[in-house]
Amino acid sequence: MRNSFKYVAPDSIRAASEYLSTEKNFFFLGGGTDLLPQIKWGLKQPSLLVDLGKIESLKGMTAREEGFFIGAMETLGNLVKNPEANRYVPVLSQSAFCVASPQIRNRATLVGNILQERRCFYVNQSEYWRQSVVPCFKLGGEVCHQSPRSQTCRAPYYSDTAPVLLALDAQVEQYDKGTFELTAVQDMIRSHIHGRGEKFFLTGVFIPYPRQGTWARFIRQGVRGAMDFASLNAAVRYTPPVNGSGPVIRIFVGASSPEPVELRETADFMIANLSRLLDLKEEVKERAVKELIKKSVLVRETAISVRAKKSSFYLVANVLEELIAAMQLKVQVSWAGLSP
């Protein structure tokens, strides 16, 4: 199928934002590593592409007074190499390093990684292949081939950076009608996944600075170390109590559901038993795996079976064991763990 669309490249945020009110069937183009293959496969058929590459104000990373800001057109490759990013948000740089290959990271943007399309064995195929099945929810139909009784699409969300951003309470900066607004990353992801095709003009990502003593880690497992999407990824953050503020534990797991899964019950149990975590270590690990099994939505994937996927859940138990050990030893690792 031959794709035909108009192409524009505005040089300002205001000029680009005007298309939100004047066009309906269009897409903003960042790195293009997710969008362009979908256009090629006929999954997206825009009448207009708005390239954001000429807008200089969308580039750059800045250490602001209350947090670290990453422009919407900053690539994952730059996020990996940038000294300030590795100083202020090294766990995010680590997760960016795990995405795909160097060639893709040099094009793909952080915002694009957040707003990537969910993938499914029955959707991400050639147009000729898709003609052999009834259109599913993602293609305008009324069925999910992964689970015919499901009332919603069950395609997994594979972003490697999203669990980290969620664990760090990050926000996205959105431009709309002449104003900049901050929205929680979690709310934006849900609007993107469960919305009705609304367009967002995101200008960057803001990560608040953590309290002193914060510890965080990112883990990932894939069939191959590069190129493949994760079979499972997770981000864990612990912030100790300081000056009357209570402790914070965030546990988010990706690639196991249509959106990242928060293990809130496990985190609450850990906070309620901070002084006994070493003795309760095995129970914590067991609770985490059980909660993940309960909240996950596992489906058939191209490179891994449901059974193999479920066996990878032990990775979450491993990183929680690492966290408990660090807490007991009072190890003040670089707050966001290891940088690449």
At which residue positions do the language-model features occur?
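C-terminal structural segment of proteins
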Residues: 1-340
